[in-house]
Amino acid sequence: MTWIGLLIVGLTAIAVQGEVPIVTRAEWNAKPPNGAIDSMETPLPRAVIAHTAGGACADDVTCSQHMRNLQNFQMSKQKFSDIGYHYLIGGNGKVYEGRSPSQRGAFAGPNNDGSLGIAFIGNFEKQAPNKEALDAAKELLEQAVKQAQLVEGYKLLGHRQVSATMSPGEALYALIQQWPNWSEEM
């Protein structure tokens, strides 16, 4: 490799350092929305942490299957136009793209407006997500501020604070209360 090739490789590494890789809708084979989705103006004032309350996943194939299953359930049984969350975090430490942050979510009833929905795939009532998943979520929150999806002083909330639910599970809820931007109030 020439010095120019090394320079290009080095600059590319610098450009992507600190960016959370996101598994796109095309990569997990999402269906298109089946109806209109209201838009929201970004940056948003809140990030809401949830869990899907179902099975967990630890590899790319299983996590993508969980994404398709959740989307199918939310579109057919819950009658959402698309998957309800903006981002989901797998046990493989990867972030999965849900709906656009500029589209109103479908996870917190009247509190969807102004909220970025981030759900961990699995049930975290008794056990917290693994370190890889937790680190991915923290990096995603930082990246969302840098990309003007969240305001710099956003409020971090648990799903149970904005909706009548046990989500994000007791173990995960206890952890996120220690994260930057945690807020007791909406």
Curated annotation (Swiss-Prot):
Start and end residues of each N-acetylmuramoyl-L-alanine amidase domain: 47-169
Keyword Disulfide bond: yes
GO terms for cellular component: extracellular region; extracellular space
Entry-linked SMART domains: Ami_2, PGRP
Keywords, alphabetical: Disulfide bond, Glycoprotein, Immunity, Innate immunity, Secreted, Signal
Signal peptide location: 1-18
Cellular location(s): Secreted
Carbohydrate attachment residues: N181
Gene Ontology process terms (BP): defense response to Gram-negative bacterium; defense response to Gram-positive bacterium; detection of peptidoglycan; innate immune response; peptidoglycan catabolic process; positive regulation of peptidoglycan recognition protein signaling pathway
Domain of life of the native organism: Eukaryota
Cysteines engaged in disulfide bonds, as pairs: C57-C63
Chief location of this protein within or outside the cell: secreted
MF terms in GO: N-acetylmuramoyl-L-alanine amidase activity; peptidoglycan binding; zinc ion binding
Record note on what altering A171T does: In strain: Sim5
Pfam families: Amidase_2
Keyword Aminoacyl-tRNA synthetase included in the entry's annotation: no
Stored CDD domains: PGRP
Effect of Q127R: In strain: Sim1, Sim2, Sim3, Sim4, Sim5, Sim6, Sim7 and Sim8
Family: Belongs to the N-acetylmuramoyl-L-alanine amidase 2 family.
Record function comment: Peptidoglycan-recognition protein that plays a key role in innate immunity by binding to peptidoglycans (PGN) of Gram-positive bacteria and activating the Toll pathway. Has no activity against on Gram-negative bacteria and fungi. Shows some partial redundancy with PRPGP-SA in Gram-positive bacteria recognition. May act by activating the proteolytic cleavage of Spatzle and the subsequent activation of Toll pathway. Recognizes S.aureus PGN.
Name the record gives this protein: Peptidoglycan-recognition protein SD
Encoding gene per record: PGRP-SD
